[in-house]
């Protein structure tokens, strides 16, 4: 989230966020609700929304409108944090561009570095385990564009219902998918 806020000239860093959201460094989890709360209370000049059930086309529409998108995805650590650690964790990645010719997104990744090229297929695989959740941070003057792009997903309850239907269909077609 620090990278996202810095995109809009915020002058803090990840440690500023951690003071409020992760006071215990060993805690590997910060959820989207906590991130949205931080934006609303510490970067109030920006709007923030998060939704579930995103897809590749939606990401591209938002990026084409000049709105970076942060997604939550699966991440695997190389070294365990504790005995029997499965090395799996959540990770946020800020998408800033895409290339249809190469079927990739450009991601700003706090772990792997800037301008990472992420194939659409890999992004879908890693994003799926978090219900394709996405976070949007944007200035107020972009709200009309965000509403138009999200369409019926702008309404939070409608977004949840539509996503529930989508995942119920997926469970019927692939009951082996743990996510």
Where are these regions (language model features)?
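Cysteine-nucleophile protease catalytic domains, especially the papain-like/related folds used
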Residues: 1-57, 65, 131-159
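Phenylalanine-focused residue identity feature
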Residues: 7-10, 15, 75-77, 92, ...
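Short, Lys/Arg-enriched charge-dense amphipathic segments
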Residues: 34-45, 71-80, 95-99, 157-164
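Active-site-adjacent substructure of cysteine-protease-like catalytic cores
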Residues: 54-110, 116-117
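Noncatalytic regulatory segments and standalone regulatory/sensor domains
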Residues: 82, 87, 98-179
